[in-house]
Structures are given as structure tokens and as C-alpha cells.
């Protein structure tokens, strides 16, 4: 089996004053990534103590660059190069579960990250003469709204589906 944890820090300045505050200025382990690393290191410790009771191989995968949609490619390529694994498990902290509870559902548990880019082109002009311009702003807004409606209109409400357009650059 393969057990994976994301461990990257984020380019966010940690403003709170807590004992576990990042010691590196301008970056922090938000989203629980330090906890993910600790869980996988704890798993490594426990598995090493019961090594003689295991029948099979466990790959512990520490994934970097998860927040930018990268890092997993190397892990997947490695696992394919060894013939694959029977099961892959991803770790993630969840605030809804009580301390000490491990939630291991059958199938996906959280949304994944996938980037996409759409270019809407216009022709500049003055706001007082919209007839002489091609305004890209309103069509771009329409696109965002239509994308956000995909889960409600095109997916079974009993299946999980999240689509989050998160950035517009103009």
C-alpha cells in the first residue's frame, strides 16, 4: 500500500502568536500540513515497531507542492515504476472529527485541485461609449457563474461535486 501526506508550506505570513508558529518568516504550514507530516512520521514509527508482523510493503509518500497542483506526479511515476500498489491512502486533518478518530471512507473523501484557464478577450473603450468597445468583464462574470452552477445542474445531488472558480485576472 501507499500512504501519502502533503507537507508543503504556504507563502502566507503567520500572524498569530502560538507556540507552534512558523519559525520561517513569510511561510507557514496552513491547512494542517505540519499535522499531515507528523501523522505520516507517526505511522512510520508504529509500522517500524510491528515490521515483523507485516506481510507486504508500505510506501510512505511525503508529497511536496500539493497546494500548487504538483508533486503527486513524481509519486505516481515511482509507484507505477514498481508495478503499482494495491491500495493508496491519502491523509488529511478534518476539524469535524473528535481527537483520536480516524475516518477511512471507501472512496474519495475530499475535493481535488485542478487548475484551468479561460481567456476572454475584449476591445478597450470608454465607459460612456460602450458601442465602441467589446466589454470582456460581463461575459467573464457569466462564465464564472455558469461554472459555479455545474454541481447543481449537472450532477446527482447525492454525489460529491465541487467546482470553485477562485481567481480572475484582468
Model-derived features with residue positions:
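Histidine/acidic-residue-rich, glycine-tolerant segments that coordinate divalent metal ions
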Residues: 10, 17-28, 34-35, 41, ...
